[in-house]
Curated annotation (Swiss-Prot):
Belongs to the neuronatin family. This is Neuronatin. Brain. May participate in the maintenance of segment identity in the hindbrain and pituitary development, and maturation or maintenance of the overall structure of the nervous system. PANTHER family: NEURONATIN. GO terms for biological process: brain development; establishment of localization in cell; insulin secretion; neuron differentiation; positive regulation of insulin secretion; regulation of protein localization; response to glucose. It comes from Rattus norvegicus (Rat). GO terms for cellular component: cytoplasm.
Length: 81
């Protein structure tokens, strides 16, 4: 029973992180498409959609692998910047 509860908690955590990443990508892409100037300091270019998506996928991969390592009891690594 405890294993089922732990697995459910892991899936909930992974699902929450996936939701957050997708929400971040959606918001960044929409801001880029609409062109809200308040997100970018004067004289800078908005972040390219591909950069936001690539970065979000890297963070998602790190989060999923980190969660797996924590479950298996392996050592932790720093998140990619």
């Amino acid at each position: 029973m405890a294993a089922v509860a732990a697995a459910s908690a892991e899936l909930l955590i992974i699902g929450w992180y996936i939701f957050r990443v997708l929400l971040q990508v959606f918001l960044e892409c929409c801001i880029y498409w609409v062109g809200f100037a308040f997100r970018n300091p004067p004289g800078t270019q908005p972040i390219a959609r591909s950069e936001v998506f690539r970065y979000s996928l890297q963070k998602l991969a790190h989060t999923v692998s980190r969660t797996g390592r924590q479950v298996l009891g392996e050592r932790r690594h720093r998140a990619p910047n």
